[in-house]
Amino acid sequence: MLEKYEILKDYKGPFDIKNYDYETLQKLAQEVRDYIINVTSKNGGHVGPSLGVVELTIALLRVFNPPEDVIVWDIGHQGYPWKILTDRKEQFPTLRQYKGISGFLRREESIYDAFGAGHSSTSISAALGFRIGKDLKGEKEDYVIAVIGDGALTAGMAYEALNNAGHIRPDRFIVILNDNEMSISPNVGAISTYLNRIISGHFVQETRQKIKNFLQHFGETPLRIMKLTEEFLKGLISPGVIFEELGFNYIGPIDGHDIKALEDTLNNVKDIKGPVLLHVYTKKGKGYKPAEENPVKWHGVAPYKVESGEIIKKSSPPTWTSVFGKALVELAERDEKIVAITPAMREGSGLVEFAKRFPDRFFDVGIAEQHACTFAAGLAAEGLRPVAAYYSTFLQRAYDQVIHDVALQNLPVTFAIDRAGLVGDDGPTHHGVFDLSYLRCVPNMVVCAPKDEQELRDLLYTGIYSGKPFALRYPRGAAYGVPTEGFKKIEIGTWEELLEGEDCVILAVGYPVYQALRAAEKLYKEGIRVGVVNARFVKPMDEKMLRDLANRYDTFITVEDNTVVGGFGSGVLEFFAREGIMKRVINLGVPDRFIEHGKQDILRNLVGIDAEGIEKAVRDALKGGRLI
């Protein structure tokens, strides 16, 4: 694939960028974009964010010297040009593939990836840690740069870091705000560009410092007057006053697609005393028309046709997400007290139709998972029926609020937890494999998982009207194709015995239930009679059924798409221990390690929670063999 690119095919690494002329750099930028489009059209991925930072990546590599100079990219959505232009040009076609390179930045993958991430708004905190660490080690000549998107600045953690950095005021510490939505009212005219060049120049900065040094002899009042005058004048033309108030030297906004302007400005700000915030504006999806026209859709996509931008869709049942979204709309039509909250996941959580139909009852709070949870708690306290839609991996960020603001007060918030279990290509930063463990230990919390589409609808209905903190978790991707109609309440804490057996019984939660049935069906043909139970409630468990099963079976196999540490299987063992019941219990689930990226079916097979893995576990258990 690389042979088609005149510049990129012979490109060796960041040192080449420092020697290219601007015409060559422009060609390189175009080739990098084309390469990203070609690879992501086959593999899927975060197209829009990466296409928007090609020139910025080139400028950073031209001005700075990583890995000695540390560059921290927020989340990693913008990381594809970085991977290509550092040391993964040849490996880029394996992007997001099993055993290939990650869709995010990973320290294990390259010396250029200073800090890994998959969740937003961590870059400034991490970069500040690098900066202070270098200062303490005497490495004061190195630079530390954080690159963060404007969307990530909706999260409180970013402002906590800005506030701390503004207080410490380290030198050679630069935060680059990649504004690809222009949500911070950029002023990008000729006057702003000219003034920006002046403000960032060495002469103005040196003169500014000399004036401050002189005024210090006359006390604080003249310095304060100077600062207020500066802020007033800059506030007329600049959106950066808030950053100045936090203690940063604000520069910008500048064109994030002008390599020379970026290079000149970066060189100018390198020696400004104290922390610098450089505001650059970019176009999400630049260079690919479909992505430019619909940046939300093209933030992250499945494989697509390059010519048309049409997403390649395989024939499959409805997704768990779409089943949830449709059910919530139906329930909201009946009950005006139902409201929906999401932290910047309207599309991903299946709430687009809800937002259209009930705009006054839909709240996208931005990347603010903690606020979303406590906001939902307040709505519940006022008598509404809030449904807070999270990805499992992001609910982790609101754990204190789940405990302190919802569960402790026993407020009826329904948590719709999408992307539970192994999510696939996005890998360990996005797998939702901890929620059963961290939720089942919380008092007052109901925790459940549906086996299929109809049960998802019924459990959602049950949760909304339960009057309790209620967590409903379901996986990413296509469901099983089970027909759906209506809603019915399910008694909380009840399980469902789907198949009676003799030799052993499988207790499965959520997605693995049908996998257990498939395994049992195959074993039945060989005369091995295995029971299967849909253990849909992880908390409270069906203790009555567990006692009954203990009278009929000696071997229990628990299956969950969650870590085995503290998960559903642990709960079964805890119950038997409390009751003094001695049984052999084998726990299948995600082992105590971070699972890599890859297709869901590959990963589920890897950890042994698909039909094949469950069948093997039964055979090993019945012959007394050890599970691996």
Curated annotation (Swiss-Prot):
Thiamine diphosphate binds at residues 77, 118-120, 151-152, 180, 288, 369. It is an enzyme of class 2 (transferase). Its EC number is 2.2.1.7. It catalyses: D-glyceraldehyde 3-phosphate + pyruvate + H(+) = 1-deoxy-D-xylulose 5-phosphate + CO2. GO terms for biological process: 1-deoxy-D-xylulose 5-phosphate biosynthetic process; isopentenyl diphosphate biosynthetic process, methylerythritol 4-phosphate pathway; terpenoid biosynthetic process; thiamine biosynthetic process. Pfam families: DXP_synthase_N (PF13292), Transket_pyr (PF02779), Transketolase_C (PF02780). One of its GO terms (molecular function) is magnesium ion binding. Its cofactor is Mg(2+); thiamine diphosphate. Binds 1 Mg(2+) ion per subunit. Mg(2+) binds at residues 150, 180. Disulfide bonds: none annotated. Pathway: Metabolic intermediate biosynthesis; 1-deoxy-D-xylulose 5-phosphate biosynthesis; 1-deoxy-D-xylulose 5-phosphate from D-glyceraldehyde 3-phosphate and pyruvate: step 1/1. Keywords: Isoprene biosynthesis, Magnesium, Metal-binding, Thiamine biosynthesis, Thiamine pyrophosphate, Transferase. The keyword Cell division does not apply. GO terms for cellular component: cytosol. Belongs to the transketolase family. DXPS subfamily. HAMAP family: DXP_synth. Homodimer. NCBIfam families: dxs, PRK05444.2-2. Catalyzes the acyloin condensation reaction between C atoms 2 and 3 of pyruvate and glyceraldehyde 3-phosphate to yield 1-deoxy-D-xylulose-5-phosphate (DXP). This is 1-deoxy-D-xylulose-5-phosphate synthase. It comes from Aquifex aeolicus (strain VF5).
